[in-house]
Amino acid sequence: LMYHAIHVMAPGEEANANLIVDPTTFESHLKALQEAGYYAVSPEEAYKILTENVLPQGKKVVWLTFDDSLWDFYDIAYPLLKQYQMQATNNVITGTVGQEANLSLEEMKEMKEHGISLQGHTVTHPPLATIEASLQQTELADSKTYLDSNLSQDTISFAYPSGSYSEETMAIAEQNNYKMALTTNEGLASAADGLLSLNRVRVLPYMTAEMLLQTIATP
């Protein structure tokens, strides 16, 4: 699942309306997922499932991803995720860490101890398919280095900014030891699509919990 912002939309935010999910709606999603028996996976667990096709304890699984490392993830989404005991992944634009509208390194370190994974979303959020290879290399390498060193981890996944990528981008991702890359292509993730071009279901503001469960139900 792909989320971005979780907050009550303020006046003047209409242009980004499709990226903003109301906290009440978000909580209804978590409650419905929990009641339907979904287990929220970490990137490492997602990778294992996609490569070995083995589900943990035979459960239904969902991967909750949030793009752009926005302030409200810590203030609003994170407490709800903890309340419902759901793991989640935030894809971090490393060049924005510590800015007022974004997560700080301290917040990320705290959340990492409580079931939140911080993965890549480049340094400056450029549409990768439109920039030259050397710049793509810098964006993918530097963001991974930042997360690896500051969070003492091996960053294995990232999301393409604005869903922009090419065959060249995927090759550069592989060279930089990313095991998975997330697109904005609509659909359920499957290894058949390639681990560096995984689909996601975009969560829109008007999606009720019932709609969400229908969208992710597998035959």
What are these regions, as identified by a protein language model?
Residues 78-86, 103-120, 174-175, 189-193:
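Acidic (Asp/Glu)-rich catalytic clusters
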Residues 1-2, 22, 39-43, 82, ...:
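Short, well-structured secondary-structure segments
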Residues 70-71, 124:
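Short, glycine/acidic-enriched loop or turn micro-motifs at the edges of active sites
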Residues 64-65, 118:
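Residue-level marker for buried hydrophobic side chains located in beta-strands
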Residues 101-106, 135-139:
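Charged helix-capping and loop-helix junction motifs
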Residues 64, 93-96, 126-129:
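Surface-exposed cleft-lining segments at the edges of enzyme active sites
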Residues 119-131:
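Substrate-binding clefts and substrate-entry loops adjacent to catalytic sites
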Residues 1-64, 71-72, 129-219:
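C-terminal active-site subregion of NodB/CE4 polysaccharide deacetylases
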